[in-house]
């Protein structure tokens, strides 16, 4: 493996595993797909067999040149040599996103594809522990993501599926976009609210009486078991108390 690869990656090379992943993506021949990380082009090739068009973004020069040579005759594939964190997804076109992403960039990339793209469905291969953190509504990331997408696990991918073999297991997850739970005009207030909420800085958000009213309205008996829906209710109370609604 080239030691100069920009972002340390673990590659999927097993035909069996790649086919299992493709099956889970439920792609159609009319789909346009943006792939994060071309790698060696194994998944790219399979995506292009089904989809109408695949645009694959790869930062590493060695991998880009390698995959460019491999895929140069494939008219359904467009390769882009760029950092995915700097890439601008289209605003009007309908598309899906697929990616086997570097573990250490998982948070940055998932925020990028959720908040800076209009993809209807997003499929990512991530570290299993990271997937669990995306579901945790006691964390900032979980509370932000849930406003835009629902998240589900599609496939478990043991460490043995990758080369080089990582120290952790991975999962294929699907993020399905839904109507936002927080309108744009309230987004900055929501991010502020979440930053204080997860750190339990309730006094920065409410007076003592307001806090009790918000808890009562949301039917919260125990803050350790609060649900996402209850947090949204508490946020709406925060807006009301501050004359924003």
Curated annotation (Swiss-Prot):
Signal peptide: none annotated. InterPro entries: KsgA/Erm (IPR001737), rRNA_Ade_diMease-like_C (IPR023165), rRNA_Ade_Mease_Trfase_CS (IPR020596), rRNA_Ade_methylase_Trfase_N (IPR020598), SAM-dependent_MTases_sf (IPR029063). Keywords: Antibiotic resistance, Methyltransferase, Plasmid, RNA-binding, S-adenosyl-L-methionine, Transferase, Transposable element. PROSITE patterns: RRNA_A_DIMETH, SAM_RNA_A_N6_MT. It catalyses: adenosine(2085) in 23S rRNA + 2 S-adenosyl-L-methionine = N(6)-dimethyladenosine(2085) in 23S rRNA + 2 S-adenosyl-L-homocysteine + 2 H(+). One of its GO terms (cellular component) is cytosol. Its EC number is 2.1.1.184. It is an enzyme of class 2 (transferase). S-adenosyl-L-methionine binds at residues 10, 12, 37, 58, 83, 100. GO terms for molecular function: 23S rRNA (adenine(2085)-N(6))-dimethyltransferase activity; RNA binding; rRNA (adenine-N6,N6-)-dimethyltransferase activity. This protein produces a dimethylation of the adenine residue at position 2085 in 23S rRNA, resulting in reduced affinity between ribosomes and macrolide-lincosamide-streptogramin B antibiotics. This is rRNA adenine N-6-methyltransferase. It comes from Enterococcus faecalis (strain ATCC 700802 / V583).
